[in-house]
Amino acid sequence: MPQVVEVLVEGGKASPGPPLGPAIGPLGLNVKQVVDEINKATKDFEGMQVPVKIIVEDPKKKTFRIEVGVPPVSQLIKKELGIPKGSSEAGHSPVGNLTMEQVIRIAKAKMDQMLAADLKAAAKEVIGTALSMGVTVEGKDPREVQKEIDEGVYDEIFANAEE
């Protein structure tokens, strides 16, 4: 059975130091080779924390493969807005504003990992994360926007997004 190591690394900037080196060193793999593969696979997510799985297929031959996950919703929101971090006073001092199109783009990227049954539910999950980060949606409190989604205010945008 293959061994699996899961780590969270900064896209395109994995290094042989912690958390990677200590996790893969004992597996007998060439740490530099693994780090190079991870950096190549995560270069599109530069500046974001990305979940990575290192699957050791054959420890004797030292063969492995890398699986790159999608960054957490909070990382996607930060990238979309170009902000370094969420608000330290969420609900009092917003740090950015997402449009519904941006919310839908993030929801589509994360859909496979979410428990949401449809795009609207996934968008509401993204909006919930925006709330906890101190980010407004369409210039409003995220809770208000979630209610508006339930009321059908954004149905046309969702219909266009699902085409």
Curated annotation (Swiss-Prot):
SMART domains in the record: RL11
Gene Ontology, cellular component aspect: large ribosomal subunit
GO molecular function: large ribosomal subunit rRNA binding; structural constituent of ribosome
Keywords from the named record: Ribonucleoprotein, Ribosomal protein, RNA-binding, rRNA-binding
Coiled-coil residues: none
Domain of life: Archaea
Keyword Ribosomal protein in annotation: yes
InterPro entries named among the record's database cross-references: Ribosomal_uL11, Ribosomal_uL11_C, Ribosomal_uL11_C_sf, Ribosomal_uL11_CS, Ribosomal_uL11_N, Ribosomal_uL11_N_sf
Gene Ontology biological process terms in this record: translation
Keyword match RNA-binding: yes
Family statement: Belongs to the universal ribosomal protein uL11 family.
Function statement: Forms part of the ribosomal stalk which helps the ribosome interact with GTP-bound translation factors.
HAMAP family with a match to the protein in the record: Ribosomal_uL11
Binding partners and assembly: Part of the ribosomal stalk of the 50S ribosomal subunit. Interacts with L10 and the large rRNA to form the base of the stalk. L10 forms an elongated spine to which L12 dimers bind in a sequential fashion forming a multimeric L10(L12)X complex.
Protein name: Large ribosomal subunit protein uL11
Source organism of this protein record: Thermococcus onnurineus (strain NA1)
